[in-house]
A protein has these predicted regions:
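Membrane-interfacial amphipathic/re-entrant helices at transmembrane-helix boundaries
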Residues: 1-31, 59, 67-74, 99-105, ...
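Cytosolic-side transmembrane-helix boundaries in multi-pass membrane proteins
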Residues: 1-2, 13, 185-192, 196-199, ...
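Transmembrane helix-bundle core of multi-pass membrane transporters
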Residues: 96, 104-173, 200-203, 268-278, ...
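Helix-loop-helix "hairpin" substructures at the membrane interface of multi-pass membrane proteins
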Residues: 20, 24-25, 145-226, 249-255
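Inter-helical junctions in multi-pass inner-membrane proteins, predominant
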Residues: 9-27, 170-175, 202-244, 264-280
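Single transmembrane alpha-helix segments in multi-pass membrane proteins
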Residues: 13-65, 88-103, 242-250, 292
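Alpha-helical transmembrane segments within multi-pass membrane transporters and channels
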Residues: 35, 68-112, 118, 255-259, ...
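Pore- or pathway-lining transmembrane helices of multi-pass membrane proteins that form conduits
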Residues: 52, 96-120, 230-242, 255-258, ...
Length: 306
Protein backbone atom coordinates (compact mmCIF):
# COMPACT_ATOMS: atom_id res chain seq x y z
CA UNK A 1 0.00 0.00 0.00
CA UNK A 2 2.85 2.37 0.80
CA UNK A 3 4.39 1.62 -2.59
CA UNK A 4 1.12 2.32 -4.41
CA UNK A 5 0.66 5.50 -2.42
CA UNK A 6 4.10 6.70 -3.40
CA UNK A 7 3.48 6.01 -7.08
CA UNK A 8 -0.01 7.37 -7.63
CA UNK A 9 -1.39 10.79 -6.64
CA UNK A 10 -4.20 11.33 -4.17
CA UNK A 11 -7.69 11.69 -5.58
CA UNK A 12 -7.66 15.42 -4.92
CA UNK A 13 -4.37 15.89 -6.75
CA UNK A 14 -5.44 13.62 -9.59
CA UNK A 15 -8.75 15.31 -10.45
CA UNK A 16 -7.31 18.05 -12.71
CA UNK A 17 -5.21 15.42 -14.50
CA UNK A 18 -8.30 13.23 -14.90
CA UNK A 19 -10.09 15.92 -16.89
CA UNK A 20 -7.00 16.50 -19.01
CA UNK A 21 -6.62 12.75 -19.54
CA UNK A 22 -10.22 12.35 -20.64
CA UNK A 23 -9.90 15.25 -23.08
CA UNK A 24 -6.69 13.84 -24.55
CA UNK A 25 -8.21 10.36 -24.64
CA UNK A 26 -11.17 11.69 -26.59
CA UNK A 27 -8.84 13.20 -29.20
CA UNK A 28 -6.90 9.92 -29.33
CA UNK A 29 -10.26 8.25 -29.93
CA UNK A 30 -11.06 10.64 -32.76
CA UNK A 31 -7.71 9.75 -34.33
CA UNK A 32 -8.06 6.04 -33.65
CA UNK A 33 -11.50 5.88 -35.24
CA UNK A 34 -10.11 7.48 -38.39
CA UNK A 35 -7.27 4.96 -38.51
CA UNK A 36 -9.61 2.00 -37.98
CA UNK A 37 -12.07 3.09 -40.68
CA UNK A 38 -9.26 3.68 -43.18
CA UNK A 39 -7.68 0.33 -42.37
CA UNK A 40 -10.98 -1.48 -42.76
CA UNK A 41 -11.64 0.19 -46.11
CA UNK A 42 -8.16 0.08 -47.64
CA UNK A 43 -6.02 -2.23 -45.52
CA UNK A 44 -3.55 0.61 -44.89
CA UNK A 45 -2.40 1.41 -41.36
CA UNK A 46 -1.91 5.15 -41.71
CA UNK A 47 1.17 5.88 -39.59
CA UNK A 48 1.49 9.37 -41.10
CA UNK A 49 -1.68 10.47 -39.29
CA UNK A 50 0.19 12.46 -36.64
CA UNK A 51 2.63 14.08 -39.07
CA UNK A 52 -0.20 15.23 -41.33
CA UNK A 53 -2.04 16.76 -38.38
CA UNK A 54 1.15 18.43 -37.14
CA UNK A 55 1.81 19.94 -40.57
CA UNK A 56 -1.71 21.33 -40.73
CA UNK A 57 -1.42 22.80 -37.22
CA UNK A 58 1.86 24.54 -38.05
CA UNK A 59 0.37 25.98 -41.23
CA UNK A 60 -2.56 27.28 -39.17
CA UNK A 61 -0.14 28.92 -36.74
CA UNK A 62 1.74 30.52 -39.64
CA UNK A 63 -1.48 31.92 -41.05
CA UNK A 64 -2.46 33.43 -37.70
CA UNK A 65 0.93 35.16 -37.62
CA UNK A 66 -0.08 36.75 -40.93
CA UNK A 67 -3.23 38.05 -39.22
CA UNK A 68 -5.64 35.57 -40.73
CA UNK A 69 -8.91 34.98 -38.95
CA UNK A 70 -8.17 32.26 -36.40
CA UNK A 71 -11.09 30.02 -37.38
CA UNK A 72 -10.30 30.37 -41.07
CA UNK A 73 -6.69 29.38 -40.33
CA UNK A 74 -7.87 26.26 -38.49
CA UNK A 75 -10.21 25.43 -41.36
CA UNK A 76 -7.28 25.67 -43.78
CA UNK A 77 -5.34 23.26 -41.52
CA UNK A 78 -8.13 20.69 -41.70
CA UNK A 79 -8.58 21.08 -45.46
CA UNK A 80 -4.82 20.85 -46.07
CA UNK A 81 -4.56 17.68 -43.96
CA UNK A 82 -7.46 16.18 -45.89
CA UNK A 83 -5.90 17.08 -49.26
CA UNK A 84 -2.50 15.62 -48.31
CA UNK A 85 -4.09 12.38 -47.12
CA UNK A 86 -6.40 12.09 -50.13
CA UNK A 87 -3.54 12.79 -52.54
CA UNK A 88 -1.40 10.11 -50.90
CA UNK A 89 -4.23 7.60 -51.08
CA UNK A 90 -5.03 8.31 -54.71
CA UNK A 91 -1.40 8.22 -55.84
CA UNK A 92 -0.19 5.22 -53.86
CA UNK A 93 -3.41 3.43 -52.89
CA UNK A 94 -3.65 1.26 -56.00
CA UNK A 95 0.02 0.27 -55.84
CA UNK A 96 -0.34 -0.75 -52.20
CA UNK A 97 -3.66 -2.56 -52.57
CA UNK A 98 -2.18 -6.01 -53.17
CA UNK A 99 0.84 -5.63 -50.91
CA UNK A 100 1.33 -7.11 -47.46
CA UNK A 101 0.02 -5.12 -44.45
CA UNK A 102 3.56 -4.47 -43.23
CA UNK A 103 4.52 -2.97 -46.59
CA UNK A 104 1.42 -0.77 -46.60
CA UNK A 105 2.15 0.56 -43.11
CA UNK A 106 5.84 1.07 -43.83
CA UNK A 107 5.01 3.04 -46.97
CA UNK A 108 3.13 5.62 -44.92
CA UNK A 109 6.28 6.15 -42.86
CA UNK A 110 7.80 7.62 -46.02
CA UNK A 111 5.15 10.35 -45.97
CA UNK A 112 5.88 10.88 -42.27
CA UNK A 113 9.58 11.42 -42.95
CA UNK A 114 8.86 13.82 -45.81
CA UNK A 115 6.53 15.91 -43.66
CA UNK A 116 8.94 15.88 -40.71
CA UNK A 117 11.69 17.10 -43.02
CA UNK A 118 9.46 19.84 -44.41
CA UNK A 119 8.42 20.96 -40.93
CA UNK A 120 12.03 21.02 -39.77
CA UNK A 121 13.02 23.09 -42.79
CA UNK A 122 10.12 25.54 -42.57
CA UNK A 123 9.71 25.94 -38.81
CA UNK A 124 11.86 23.93 -36.41
CA UNK A 125 15.24 25.10 -37.70
CA UNK A 126 14.18 28.71 -37.13
CA UNK A 127 13.34 28.05 -33.50
CA UNK A 128 9.90 27.29 -32.12
CA UNK A 129 9.86 28.08 -28.42
CA UNK A 130 7.31 30.88 -28.84
CA UNK A 131 4.93 28.99 -31.14
CA UNK A 132 1.58 28.00 -29.73
CA UNK A 133 -1.99 27.41 -30.78
CA UNK A 134 -4.55 28.70 -28.31
CA UNK A 135 -8.18 28.02 -29.09
CA UNK A 136 -10.61 30.79 -28.06
CA UNK A 137 -12.53 28.19 -26.06
CA UNK A 138 -9.57 27.90 -23.67
CA UNK A 139 -10.71 31.15 -22.05
CA UNK A 140 -14.18 29.85 -21.20
CA UNK A 141 -15.32 27.08 -18.91
CA UNK A 142 -16.79 26.25 -15.54
CA UNK A 143 -15.87 24.84 -12.15
CA UNK A 144 -16.76 21.22 -11.42
CA UNK A 145 -16.25 20.67 -7.70
CA UNK A 146 -12.78 22.10 -7.27
CA UNK A 147 -11.68 21.53 -10.87
CA UNK A 148 -11.54 24.14 -13.59
CA UNK A 149 -12.92 22.62 -16.79
CA UNK A 150 -12.36 24.53 -20.03
CA UNK A 151 -14.80 24.60 -22.89
CA UNK A 152 -12.05 23.13 -25.08
CA UNK A 153 -11.91 20.02 -22.90
CA UNK A 154 -15.68 19.63 -23.04
CA UNK A 155 -15.63 20.03 -26.83
CA UNK A 156 -12.92 17.37 -27.07
CA UNK A 157 -15.03 14.87 -25.13
CA UNK A 158 -18.11 15.73 -27.17
CA UNK A 159 -16.17 15.45 -30.44
CA UNK A 160 -14.87 12.02 -29.47
CA UNK A 161 -18.36 10.77 -28.66
CA UNK A 162 -19.99 12.34 -31.73
CA UNK A 163 -17.26 11.02 -34.04
CA UNK A 164 -17.58 7.49 -32.66
CA UNK A 165 -21.38 7.41 -32.72
CA UNK A 166 -21.61 9.23 -36.04
CA UNK A 167 -19.07 6.96 -37.72
CA UNK A 168 -20.85 3.89 -36.41
CA UNK A 169 -24.16 5.13 -37.77
CA UNK A 170 -22.53 6.04 -41.08
CA UNK A 171 -21.02 2.58 -41.50
CA UNK A 172 -24.26 0.86 -40.59
CA UNK A 173 -27.00 2.91 -42.21
CA UNK A 174 -25.54 4.53 -45.33
CA UNK A 175 -24.81 2.95 -48.69
CA UNK A 176 -21.22 4.18 -48.69
CA UNK A 177 -20.72 2.94 -45.14
CA UNK A 178 -22.05 -0.55 -45.85
CA UNK A 179 -19.82 -0.67 -48.92
CA UNK A 180 -16.80 0.11 -46.74
CA UNK A 181 -17.77 -2.69 -44.39
CA UNK A 182 -18.16 -5.06 -47.32
CA UNK A 183 -14.70 -4.10 -48.59
CA UNK A 184 -13.27 -4.83 -45.16
CA UNK A 185 -14.74 -8.34 -45.26
CA UNK A 186 -13.78 -9.21 -48.84
CA UNK A 187 -12.35 -6.60 -51.17
CA UNK A 188 -12.17 -8.84 -54.26
CA UNK A 189 -15.79 -9.98 -54.09
CA UNK A 190 -16.92 -6.39 -53.52
CA UNK A 191 -15.04 -5.31 -56.65
CA UNK A 192 -16.64 -8.06 -58.76
CA UNK A 193 -20.08 -6.75 -57.77
CA UNK A 194 -19.37 -3.52 -59.62
CA UNK A 195 -18.67 -1.38 -56.56
CA UNK A 196 -16.57 1.72 -57.42
CA UNK A 197 -13.64 0.76 -55.20
CA UNK A 198 -11.61 3.87 -55.95
CA UNK A 199 -14.45 6.20 -54.95
CA UNK A 200 -15.03 4.34 -51.71
CA UNK A 201 -11.33 4.42 -50.91
CA UNK A 202 -11.20 8.13 -51.73
CA UNK A 203 -13.98 8.77 -49.21
CA UNK A 204 -12.10 6.80 -46.55
CA UNK A 205 -8.84 8.66 -47.21
CA UNK A 206 -10.62 12.01 -47.21
CA UNK A 207 -12.43 11.31 -43.93
CA UNK A 208 -9.22 10.15 -42.29
CA UNK A 209 -7.46 13.32 -43.45
CA UNK A 210 -10.18 15.54 -41.99
CA UNK A 211 -9.85 13.80 -38.62
CA UNK A 212 -6.05 14.14 -38.79
CA UNK A 213 -6.39 17.88 -39.30
CA UNK A 214 -8.86 18.28 -36.44
CA UNK A 215 -6.74 16.17 -34.10
CA UNK A 216 -3.59 18.09 -35.02
CA UNK A 217 -5.08 21.49 -34.20
CA UNK A 218 -6.65 20.35 -30.92
CA UNK A 219 -3.57 18.43 -29.74
CA UNK A 220 -1.41 21.45 -30.56
CA UNK A 221 -3.58 23.36 -28.09
CA UNK A 222 -3.79 20.65 -25.42
CA UNK A 223 -0.17 19.43 -25.58
CA UNK A 224 2.27 21.54 -27.60
CA UNK A 225 2.77 22.95 -31.07
CA UNK A 226 5.83 20.83 -31.78
CA UNK A 227 6.30 18.82 -34.95
CA UNK A 228 7.94 15.79 -33.33
CA UNK A 229 5.60 15.69 -30.34
CA UNK A 230 2.46 15.86 -32.45
CA UNK A 231 3.79 13.35 -34.96
CA UNK A 232 4.43 10.69 -32.35
CA UNK A 233 1.25 11.28 -30.36
CA UNK A 234 -0.25 9.01 -33.02
CA UNK A 235 1.24 6.15 -30.99
CA UNK A 236 -1.52 6.53 -28.39
CA UNK A 237 -4.19 6.47 -31.10
CA UNK A 238 -2.52 3.48 -32.74
CA UNK A 239 -2.44 1.66 -29.41
CA UNK A 240 -6.19 2.23 -28.97
CA UNK A 241 -6.82 0.92 -32.48
CA UNK A 242 -4.65 -2.15 -31.84
CA UNK A 243 -6.49 -2.87 -28.59
CA UNK A 244 -9.66 -2.92 -30.71
CA UNK A 245 -7.81 -5.20 -33.15
CA UNK A 246 -8.45 -2.58 -35.85
CA UNK A 247 -12.10 -3.61 -35.96
CA UNK A 248 -14.38 -1.98 -33.40
CA UNK A 249 -14.62 1.80 -33.25
CA UNK A 250 -16.47 1.57 -29.91
CA UNK A 251 -13.64 -0.40 -28.32
CA UNK A 252 -11.20 2.05 -29.91
CA UNK A 253 -13.03 4.92 -28.19
CA UNK A 254 -13.05 3.21 -24.79
CA UNK A 255 -9.41 2.16 -25.09
CA UNK A 256 -8.37 5.69 -26.04
CA UNK A 257 -10.09 7.13 -22.96
CA UNK A 258 -8.40 4.55 -20.74
CA UNK A 259 -5.01 5.35 -22.29
CA UNK A 260 -5.56 9.06 -21.72
CA UNK A 261 -6.56 8.58 -18.07
CA UNK A 262 -3.76 6.09 -17.28
CA UNK A 263 -1.25 8.38 -18.94
CA UNK A 264 -2.53 11.29 -16.84
CA UNK A 265 -2.40 9.22 -13.63
CA UNK A 266 1.23 8.29 -14.24
CA UNK A 267 2.16 11.86 -15.18
CA UNK A 268 0.54 13.12 -11.96
CA UNK A 269 2.54 10.68 -9.84
CA UNK A 270 4.37 12.25 -6.88
CA UNK A 271 7.24 9.89 -7.74
CA UNK A 272 9.22 11.77 -10.39
CA UNK A 273 10.97 8.63 -11.59
CA UNK A 274 7.64 6.86 -12.14
CA UNK A 275 6.01 9.84 -13.87
CA UNK A 276 8.76 9.83 -16.49
CA UNK A 277 7.35 6.55 -17.81
CA UNK A 278 3.94 7.96 -18.77
CA UNK A 279 4.80 7.73 -22.48
CA UNK A 280 5.02 3.95 -22.11
CA UNK A 281 1.38 3.58 -21.03
CA UNK A 282 -0.02 3.11 -24.58
CA UNK A 283 2.56 0.40 -25.37
CA UNK A 284 1.91 -1.49 -22.13
CA UNK A 285 -1.88 -1.38 -22.43
CA UNK A 286 -1.78 -2.43 -26.09
CA UNK A 287 0.61 -5.29 -25.30
CA UNK A 288 -1.62 -6.54 -22.47
CA UNK A 289 -4.73 -6.38 -24.67
CA UNK A 290 -3.04 -8.24 -27.52
CA UNK A 291 -1.72 -10.92 -25.16
CA UNK A 292 -5.19 -11.43 -23.66
CA UNK A 293 -6.78 -11.60 -27.12
CA UNK A 294 -4.18 -14.10 -28.29
CA UNK A 295 -4.67 -16.22 -25.17
CA UNK A 296 -8.43 -16.32 -25.74
CA UNK A 297 -7.84 -17.34 -29.34
CA UNK A 298 -5.50 -20.15 -28.28
CA UNK A 299 -8.00 -21.40 -25.68
CA UNK A 300 -10.81 -21.31 -28.26
CA UNK A 301 -8.74 -23.29 -30.76
CA UNK A 302 -7.75 -25.86 -28.15
CA UNK A 303 -11.38 -26.37 -27.14
CA UNK A 304 -12.68 -26.78 -30.67
CA UNK A 305 -9.72 -28.87 -31.76
CA UNK A 306 -9.24 -26.78 -34.91
Amino acid sequence: MLLVGSLFPSWQDFQPFLITGLALGAVYALSGVGMVVLYRATGVLYLAFGAVGAFGALVAWQLTQSHWNIWLAYLVAVVLSAVITLAYGMVFGSALAAREPVVKATATLGLTLILLGAMDLLWTSSGGASRAILLPTDNHGFVLGQINVTTTQVICLAAGVVTTVGTGAFLRFTKLGTTMRAMANDREITATLGVPIRRVEAAAWLGCGVLAGLAGVVLADLVALDATTLTFLVISSLAAALIAQLRSIVITFIAALVIGVVDAAIEASPNQGFSNYHDMAPFVLAAIALLVANRKRVISISRTGI
